[in-house]
């Protein structure tokens, strides 16, 4: 149990200690399983993590340090206190703009859009993404943003009752899917779809499960990969397995 606490603490402590920049943290599935089994310990460590961040924030001597701390506090609050997470996402974005760092602005904008989507504010998420200067994004951030766009439009398509709107959202989702295929041909979510069309469910599952294990829970790719895995399990009739990957 204490190994779990130490693992979590080391993962959560990194940015406030100055060791991590946006988008670099990874959590293995075994670590995540241990976190779920020891949820009470995780809550305690998370509060300690936030206290550490607050202390680091009070002692910070540069805008860049504050930007990274805000970014990490947003991540720590994610799905825990969404209002606090949104607050720190906004502070991170403000600091990134003041720094004039396009890479930080891109990462912070995507993080803020994610908070809006988590809160059910799809249109605010889209508006935030639409303001991002794509020329300043890394290839990784651009791929994640396209996946996020696709995910939002697919979600809106499923929720819309208006036929013309459903068609519009569907066309936008396809547009971003096509962009991913052309610009990021190694994207496993898209490649797995081709394997499914060919009837090779085994290879598609192996590819997706391997990718899933490499992702941190908060990674934007996690949602599309979850959905793709669940869809394959449903297609082959493994409903119990599918429920493990269905996301709310």
What are these regions (language model features)?
Residues 1-6:
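Bacterial N-terminal signal peptides that target proteins for export
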Residues 8, 16-248:
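A "functional boundary" signal
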